[in-house]
C-alpha cells in the first residue's frame, strides 16, 4: 500500500514578468475600448462589426500573457534568455495590436489586406510579428518544458499545453496561404466561400463554411486549458480522495491532452473540408465519437491506476 499526500499547487519562485503583466493590463483596457466601440460604432468590416476582431484579440492576449507570466514564475530561476523572449512577445504583441486597432480606426481590415501600399506594408509587418511571436514562445516553451514545475501532473500539463499551443500558433499560417477570391485581399480564414459569411454569436466563426480560425484559437489556448485542469484536480484532491494520487492526476492530464490534441486535429480537418463547426457530417461525428470513447477509456484506466493507494497523509 502506497502513501498518498494531499497535494498543493506549486508556488511561484520568481516575480511575475512585468512587461507581460503590463501588456495584459493594457489589453484588458483595450477590451473595454472595443466593447464601447461595438456599442457606438455601427461600421461593418469583413462581414462583422468593426470592433469585434480587435476586442477578440485583446481578450486573447490577456489570457495568453497572464498564463505565460504565471508559468514562467514557477521556475526556480528565470534565465535572461527566457525573460528577453517574453519581452519580445510583448513587443510583437504591441505592434500587432497597434496595427489591428489602427486599421479599425481607418475603417479597413487588418488581416490579409494588400489593397494599398500602406495596407500591404502593415500586413507584411503583422506577418513578421506573428512569426517572431511564435519563435519567442517556442524558446520560452523549450525552457519551461525542461523544468520541473510542480508534481508530475502539473509539469506535464504545462509541457503538453505548450506543445499543443505551438501547433495552434503554427496553424495560423494556413490562412495567409489561401486564395481569398477578392481583389486586394491576400489570404482568408473561410474555406469554401469568401470571408464575411454569417457567423456564430461571440466568436464570429462561420455557420455556413469551414473556418480556420477555430483550430488556431483552440490550439493556442491549450496553454491555459491544460494547466488550469491540472490545478483544478489539485484543488479538488482534498475533497476527492481518488485525486490525491499523483498517478491518477497524471493519467487524467495525459488523457485530457491526448483528447485535446485529437479535437484540434478534428476541427482542423473539418475546417479544411469547408464544413462549419455546428453542422458536422457523418465522418466528423464518427471521428468525434472515437475521440470521446478514447477519452472515457483513458479516464477509466487512470482511475484504475489508483488501486492499492489507500492511506492518506495531509501534507
Predicted segments, located by residue:
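Membrane-interfacial catalytic/cofactor-binding modules of polytopic membrane enzymes
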Residues: 176-223
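Non-cytosolic membrane-interface motifs at loop->transmembrane helix junctions
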Residues: 45-54, 112-125, 152-156, 276-287
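Internal, conserved structured core segments that host functional sites
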Residues: 112-149
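Membrane-interface capping segments at transmembrane-helix boundaries
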Residues: 298-315
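Membrane-interfacial loop-to-helix junctions in multi-pass inner-membrane proteins
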Residues: 15-17, 79-90, 151-158
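Hydrophobic cores of alpha-helical transmembrane segments in multi-pass integral membrane proteins
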Residues: 19-39, 51-73, 87-105, 125-140, ...
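Aromatic-rich transmembrane-lumenal/periplasmic boundary elements in polytopic membrane proteins
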Residues: 153-190
Amino acid at each position: 500500500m502506497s502513501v498518498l499526500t494531499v497535494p498543493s499547487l506549486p508556488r511561484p519562485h520568481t516575480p511575475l514578468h512585468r512587461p507581460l503583466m503590463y501588456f495584459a493590463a493594457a489589453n484588458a483596457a483595450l477590451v473595454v475600448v472595443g466593447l464601447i466601440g461595438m456599442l457606438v460604432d455601427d461600421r461593418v468590416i469583413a462581414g462583422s462589426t468593426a470592433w469585434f476582431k480587435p476586442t477578440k484579440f485583446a481578450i486573447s492576449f490577456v489570457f495568453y500573457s497572464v498564463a505565460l507570466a504565471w508559468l514562467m514564475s514557477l521556475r526556480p530561476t528565470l534565465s535572461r534568455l527566457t525573460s528577453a523572449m517574453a519581452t519580445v512577445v510583448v513587443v510583437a504583441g504591441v505592434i500587432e495590436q497597434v496595427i489591428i486597432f489602427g486599421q479599425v480606426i481607418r475603417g479597413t481590415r487588418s488581416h490579409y489586406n494588400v489593397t494599398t501600399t500602406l495596407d500591404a506594408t502593415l500586413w507584411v509587418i503583422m506577418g513578421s510579428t506573428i512569426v517572431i511571436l511564435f519563435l519567442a514562445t517556442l524558446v520560452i516553451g523549450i525552457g519551461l518544458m525542461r523544468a520541473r514545475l510542480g508534481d508530475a501532473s502539473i509539469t506535464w500539463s504545462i509541457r503538453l499545453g505548450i506543445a499543443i499551443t505551438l501547433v495552434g500558433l503554427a496553424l495560423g499560417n494556413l490562412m495567409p496561404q489561401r486564395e481569398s477570391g477578392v481583389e486586394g485581399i491576400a489570404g482568408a480564414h473561410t474555406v469554401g466561400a469568401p470571408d464575411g459569411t454569417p457567423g456564430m454569436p461571440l466568436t464570429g466563426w462561420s455557420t455556413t463554411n469551414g473556418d480556420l480560425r477555430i483550430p488556431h484559437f483552440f490550439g493556442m489556448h491549450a496553454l491555459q486549458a491544460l494547466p488550469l485542469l491540472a490545478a483544478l484536480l489539485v484543488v479538488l484532491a482534498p475533497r476527492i480522495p481518488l485525486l490525491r494520487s499523483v498517478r491518477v492526476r497524471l493519467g487524467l492530464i495525459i488523457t485530457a491532452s491526448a483528447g485535446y490534441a485529437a479535437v484540434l486535429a478534428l476541427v482542423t480537418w473539418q475546417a479544411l473540408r469547408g464544413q462549419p463547426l455546428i453542422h458536422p457530417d457523418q465522418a466528423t461525428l464518427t471521428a468525434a465519437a472515437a475521440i470521446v470513447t478514447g477519452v472515457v477509456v483513458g479516464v477509466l484506466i487512470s482511475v484504475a491506476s489508483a488501486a492499492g493507494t489507500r492511506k492518506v497523509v495531509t501534507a
